[in-house]
Amino acid sequence: MSNLITAAQAKEFDIKKCLVHSNDGTTKSDIGVLITDLYYFEDLFSPTLKVDILFGDTGTVKEGGVFKNAVDALQMVGTEQVDLELIDPNDQKIKVTLYTDAIVPIAKENRKSLVSVTLGSKESIMNYKTTVNYRLDGRISDHITRILTETLKVDGKKKLDIEQTSWWKM
């Protein structure tokens, strides 16, 4: 049995696809070949994963017959869907859909720029952008279920594993 690699440099990932969809759904582009650095984070104490990518935006996205840089063509402002497929250093295929959280231009010149993008799950992004503005009475487990389904609108395909409140004085 071989030892698993638990930490790896970005160069060791084989990026198969990094397809970014614009928020209006009209434009999409695979920026996988533009990525210079990729940092993939999984944490035992975090309910979600996080990916940071750094890419050279060189005007390779065609929109309306004109080549534009990816940030402008996709109108990247946050919450864009990103379909990511890669193979990690342990030869495990990772296929995940994430959403853009932070888009930071690091360096910009005429027709080219260096951009840092932070990706996270839809729930983690919605968690920071949504507030609960109503009072809740009753069992804590019922509150969690209500917040996840009604306020955060967690996908119905995901199984909610919520431990029921065992003691509650009515």
Predicted regions mapped to residue ranges:
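Assembly/oligomerization scaffold segments
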Residues: 1-131
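Charged- and aromatic-enriched interaction segments used to assemble
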Residues: 111-170
